[in-house]
């Protein structure tokens, strides 16, 4: 498909690589430890973090439905947009309900830093796909009662909520990671970062 899209001058339709190196590199433990086998010996184990069909097209083949439905997707992040994309390709009529004024969800914060250009490329690709596929997107539309959808199927794609440390004195002054990364809440000169995972390390950096 990559070559076909280039030949058809449809380069913008190619899903961008985010350089995660998690699936496509020769990193599988096929013979005990990473990188001790020839690439040709592990090609069948290649995967892609942003394209489930990579080397698994039979498993993830998108089959057309015989009974198209209107499906309401609550949340317009990456998960919601991918759900809408696949549903549309299957022949359904997905409708995205996003309570904010833009698509992207937590991925907007995840791609905010200057060195996260590849993530921003992926986010832009999803937005283009929503437009090109003609998927209905309702921004500033917070869903409060799914009964309004009647019997239509509903997909919840709202993501996770941050854990508030209410037992810690002064928690009301805390800034949530996404708030900082999006620049919506400032911090002082001396900052205590609670959590040393990838997000905490990125914020400390």
Predicted features along the sequence, with ranges:
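A short helix-to-beta-strand connector/capping loop
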Residues: 44, 130-137, 170-173
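Rossmann-like dinucleotide/flavin-binding elements
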Residues: 68-97, 138-146, 150, 158-167, ...
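A short, gly/pro- and small-residue-rich
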Residues: 4-10, 167-182
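N-terminal Rossmann-like dinucleotide/flavin-binding domain of flavoprotein oxidoreductases
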Residues: 105-149
